[in-house]
Amino acid sequence: MRILITNDDGIAAQGIKILEEIAHKISDDVTVVAPDKERSGMAHSLTLSLPSRLYKHDDRHYSVSGTPSDSVVMGIKEIMKDNPPDLVLSGINHGANLAEDVTYSGTVSAAMEGAIAGIRSIGLSQVYSPDFKNGALSFDTAVSWGEKVIRQLIDSTLPNRTFYNVNFPACENDDVKGIRVVAQGHRDYGRLNVEKGVDPRGKDWYWLALGEAISKDNLNGDLDLSYQNYVTVTPLAPNLTDVASLQPLTDILAK
């Protein structure tokens, strides 16, 4: 099995190194193609108005001066074009990708790009909690559960255009309750904040910052189950159609 690994935290990030170690337990044919620096929050963006640079670190490690989706495209269309990957793994993200996080996430969108190409694809994230080990991000649950989850999803009979969003809970490994397949949850709007300051030349600057929002998650959604110390797996698809609204909207526009 040929595995392509990417992320949105950059090729030097701890999470992608851990994911590579996990991948090598599954296959000895692993190639890493990741952004040359952190590209968090890039969603499914592509670099179309500028050239991209490809940096070869060795035969198995490459970095791209672009987005996570750029990296997947570069891996499939250039680096592995003669032997395309059978599996795309994206992560392990430094922090959760739960609920509406998936719409901003470069990690999840890189997995989406793989799915669009018809390749089995999985995005993986380690949930971060400020209360966990004095704010330190531990990948212990990802290390312990990652291989098992990936192997099970590889064997999935769902179409390859279905991809998976996996989140490992922020708890001690012994406290993980198991794996749950869940729907995408919901966060109340307000997690994004705008920080304002003044630069040395007296001009205003603005910085978007992620905070915590009080959330009334749907029961048994990914937020809810992650908070309960489950490894959550959510099947996603590139098709964003709100199927339940098709007929009501048809009725409205037919008037």
UniProtKB/Swiss-Prot annotation:
Cofactor(s) of this protein: a divalent metal cation
Pfam families membership: SurE
A single cellular component GO annotation: cytoplasm
E.C. number: 3.1.3.5
GO MF term set: 3'-nucleotidase activity; 5'-nucleotidase activity; exopolyphosphatase activity; metal ion binding; nucleotide binding
Keyword presence, Ion transport: no
Function text: Nucleotidase that shows phosphatase activity on nucleoside 5'-monophosphates.
Protein name per UniProt: 5'-nucleotidase SurE
Organism in which the protein naturally occurs: Zymomonas mobilis subsp. mobilis (strain ATCC 31821 / ZM4 / CP4)
Lineage of producing organism: Bacteria, Pseudomonadati, Pseudomonadota, Alphaproteobacteria, Sphingomonadales
